[in-house]
Amino acid sequence: MSVNGTCEPVNIRRCSCTSEGFSPKKSITSPLSISGRRTSKVLDEAHLPKQLLVQHHHEDGAFLRNISATELVLEVQETANAQQLGAPSALPESRVLVLYTGGTIGMKSSDGVYCPVPGYLPEVLRDIPPLNDRRYVEENYSNMAVRPYSLPPVRHMKKRVVYWIVEYEPLLDSCDMTFDDWIRIATDIKKAYHKYDGFVVLHGTDTLAYTASALSFMMENLGKPVIVTGSQIPVAEVRSDGMENLIGALITAGNFDIPEVCVYFNNKLMRGNRTVKLDNSALEAFDSPNMHPIAQMAINIKVHYDSIFRSDMVAAFTVHENLCRDVGMLRIFPSMTIESVRAFLQPPTRGVILQTFGSGNMPTRRQDIILALKEAINRGVMVVNCSQCLKGQVDVNYATGKILYDIGVIPGSDMTSEAAMAKLCYVLGKDEWDLPMKRSMLQANLRGEMTVATKGAMRELDIIPHLAKCLRVSSSQEVQLLRDIILPPMFCNAAKTNDVETMKALKSSGVNFVATDYNLRTALHVAASNGNLESVKYLLSIGTNVHTKDMFGYNALVCAVKAKAMDCIVAIREAGGFIDATAQKIGVELCLAVYQNDMDLLKCNHAAGIHMGEKDYDNRTALHVAVSLNKPEIVAYLLQCGLDPNEKDDFGMTPIGEAKRRNLKDLETLMMTYKPVELQNGEVFHMD
């Protein structure tokens, strides 16, 4: 189905597993798929347009079917509906979407060399026990056409990771990645954003750091983990870092509140825009030279929550697709010619990463180069100064570095070249910003990509030393454990009592404000459940995740709806909150609200972006129930929301028919004046 409602033929490839992996047997067409449509102009001639492939299960075998990100959301929604009707899992499920772009991790060994084989990775993962619990999948998802994979339960993890894999066609060597591929990955994640708890991007290692950096800037107000990983050895090999990297990425994406684009490699989780490739043959191929890892996988998983970057912008997740292509990297070296510098700075160049010596130093005797840079800056070219060294940062206190600062070169602190390039493309692509704003943004820490001076120091609460003394706790590890046990419940209690000042004091002491209680509830859950608007606003301002779910599957927005706290609902929605319950569950809740004559609850559901036309298990809408119970006020409200009085349930009855059968003339007249309107809801996905 296309956006205008017409059916479009979409190629489906029937495949079978052979010695060469998946191979196409024949091509057929189907009107069932929704073909992907590009919304932005492709500017890179080297870019290869891509399609998403998903493994489709049928009685006759497995298919590789073309699918759009939007259609995949609908398929997974169907899967979620079916799973919830089955036996409950011992662990809550966390859903992860894996986007396979190519790279060594999914390759097949053939005649001693690794090569990409379409469809091979999704099939081979089915038979790797650490990556797929076949029994669990067969018990819970055997009837599904798009069948997921499931990690076995992981010790100390509170959720079971269930994941889906989509494969890009064609598979690419990472050297062939373009800006348009980054845009495609980011927009596919955006389309599926509200239906998954996290995302994993499988990528070749050569340009992995570039992709991670670019995604980190393009994805604005990110509230869920996006983990980029790859490997040096394919996942299906006997000796493989690919299996460990994929397992670690899935565990991280499905279990931890880390709303960043990260790179997972060799038991380390690193901020994406801080990561560089250091070695082309070792398993520890990536490192973060100027920042400690966010998390480390040992016997236990150690997450440094104080290192996680959280946006202080209270806004919904979005993707910025406009990247400036007219940028380049100019590496300074001894005796370089002025002609090469001038040629590099000529239009259409709009941005330059200047890679200088040491701490940002430039040869002071090369006034010709300095003059050429000054002329370029005066005509609007943005020049960012980055060190050629992997560690350390640009320092303008040296005369050789200050001379660049004085002519308008922007100090890049300790940004990697990959991050500086991605940031420059992103900032120059912000057409709504003027030149001074762009210069300011290049010097600001937008995504944790650079070190900046901090304002104020963390202070310890008086209660912790006293408790440590009373409990005879002396070692630093024991004191830290005491803090981790005591402070998070105090933070939740402050949210319950709407004590913002106490929350501020606790945060300044270094409390992990995203820690959960025994029901996996955060302070934002507690504040929303109690309708405490001031606490909700404060928690949102410090980056508390609106998507975190408790053990009952409720996020903070659901808690606010149940509390009928309209102001909290509005605030959480502005921060990107979204209710992703199944359609049938929403339909039952709406019908129940009508039965209870709870107009406030209906209005809160509507304010929360709920699709007001969802149906219950008999395909009855809330309007069916309102008419059968003769509730004129609710009927009028639901009609204003766009519900159709001619909608039939499983018994063939419409709301108008129900009014006629019950001789409810006033309701019949009210509905007869109904004019079809677009159903009002909070749906953010569009069929494209």
Each predicted region: which residue ranges?
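Accessory alpha-helical/coil subdomains and C-terminal extensions
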Residues: 90-93, 99, 120-140, 149-157, ...
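Conserved ankyrin/ankyrin-like repeat signature
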Residues: 502, 534-535, 567-568, 600-601, ...
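Ankyrin repeat boundary/linker residues
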Residues: 517, 550, 583-584, 616, ...
